[in-house]
């Protein structure tokens, strides 16, 4: 995961200090890209321990089209707690836009199901896109989509995915985003009869919060270790049938966890 450490170092050395919505302050750059070959291991950060359980359950929650944190809470995942209302609702966030995008004529569009079908039927299409950024509903969301749009690409029997992330919390959020979209790419590849290719991560505003500088410096002192391998149950051929038990991580040997505050 040298690419991730390179991003962190680049922002610390070359970023612009800015104020932000949360009042914490950031150092940021605009426009940056990382690439991960999914054939060379699962890109789960090794320079600090990550909570894989949260990453998997959040992705399954997105794919269910769910926007209430009850499923997450039932599975001991708390990453969305700060943004939910008293009933656990978040408004029309990721899952709603992925699976139930509202059309002007009253229909609801299942973008995920549509893109799976298109990958199978027309893999050379340049329209293999899912968007979570819905301008008509952004103000109703507890948190507007940070990872806003992703596109798939098929070549030589391999499925690759590129994510555009408008806003990226490098220390806390980005490691989760890398693992989540890498896993989604692997799942999509399996159900479409393809191998997983690359995950390409493209950023708009990539930033380190000022209260994460010390933690970032500590992480940069650590040497990356070999990437783990993600095993996925080969019997699952329907994207919406995956369960937590269908995933097994092998060979994960990270450095210790580094605690940092979330800016809300």
Swiss-Prot record:
One of its GO terms (biological process) is dTMP biosynthetic process. Its EC number is 2.1.1.45. The keyword Oxidoreductase does not apply. It catalyses: dUMP + (6R)-5,10-methylene-5,6,7,8-tetrahydrofolate = 7,8-dihydrofolate + dTMP. CDD domains: TS_Pyrimidine_HMase (cd00351). Its main location: cytoplasm. Pfam families: Thymidylat_synt (PF00303). GO terms for molecular function: thymidylate synthase activity. Disulfide bonds: none annotated. InterPro entries: Thymidate_synth/dCMP_Mease (IPR045097), Thymidate_synth/dCMP_Mease_dom (IPR023451), Thymidate_synth/dCMP_Mease_sf (IPR036926), Thymidylate_synthase (IPR000398), Thymidylate_synthase_AS (IPR020940). GO terms for cellular component: cytosol. (6R)-5,10-methylene-5,6,7,8-tetrahydrofolate binds at residues 51, 169, 263. It comes from the Bacteria. DUMP binds at residues 21, 126-127, 166-169, 177, 207-209. It is found in: Cytoplasm. Pathway: Pyrimidine metabolism; dTTP biosynthesis. Belongs to the thymidylate synthase family. Bacterial-type ThyA subfamily. Catalyzes the reductive methylation of 2'-deoxyuridine-5'-monophosphate (dUMP) to 2'-deoxythymidine-5'-monophosphate (dTMP) while utilizing 5,10-methylenetetrahydrofolate (mTHF) as the methyl donor and reductant in the reaction, yielding dihydrofolate (DHF) as a by-product. This enzymatic reaction provides an intracellular de novo source of dTMP, an essential precursor for DNA biosynthesis. NCBIfam families: PRK01827.1-3, PRK01827.1-5, thym_sym. PANTHER family: THYMIDYLATE SYNTHASE (PTHR11548:SF9), THYMIDYLATE SYNTHASE 1 (PTHR11548). Homodimer. This is Thymidylate synthase. It comes from Neisseria meningitidis serogroup C / serotype 2a (strain ATCC 700532 / DSM 15464 / FAM18). The gene is thyA.
């Amino acid at each position: 995961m040298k690419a991730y450490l390179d991003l962190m170092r680049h922002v610390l050395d070359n970023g612009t200090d800015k104020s932000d919505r949360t009042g914490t302050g950031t150092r940021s750059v605009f426009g940056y890209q990382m690439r991960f070959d999914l054939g060379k291991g699962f890109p789960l950060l090794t320079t600090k321990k990550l909570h894989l359980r949260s990453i998997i359950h959040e992705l399954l929650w997105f794919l269910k089209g769910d926007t209430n944190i009850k499923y997450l809470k039932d599975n001991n995942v708390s990453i969305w707690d700060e943004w939910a209302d008293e009933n656990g609702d978040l408004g029309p966030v990721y899952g709603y836009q992925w699976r139930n995008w509202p059309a002007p004529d009253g229909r609801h569009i299942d973008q995920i199901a549509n893109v799976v079908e298109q990958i199978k039927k027309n893999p050379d299409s340049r329209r293999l896109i899912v968007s979570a950024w819905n301008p008509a509903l952004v103000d109703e969301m507890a948190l507007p989509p940070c990872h806003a749009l992703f596109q798939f690409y098929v070549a030589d029997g391999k499925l690759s995915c590129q994510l555009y992330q408008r806003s990226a919390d490098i220390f806390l959020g980005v490691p989760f985003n890398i693992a989540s979209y890498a896993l989604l790419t692997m799942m999509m590849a399996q159900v479409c009869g393809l191998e997983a290719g690359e995950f390409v991560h493209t950023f708009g505003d990539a930033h380190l919060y000022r209260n994460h500088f010390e933690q970032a410096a500590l992480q940069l002192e650590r040497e990356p270790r070999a990437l783990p391998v993600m095993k996925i149950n080969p019997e699952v051929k329907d994207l919406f049938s995956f369960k937590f038990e269908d995933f097994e991580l092998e060979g994960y040997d990270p450095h210790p966890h580094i605690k940092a505050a979330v800016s809300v």
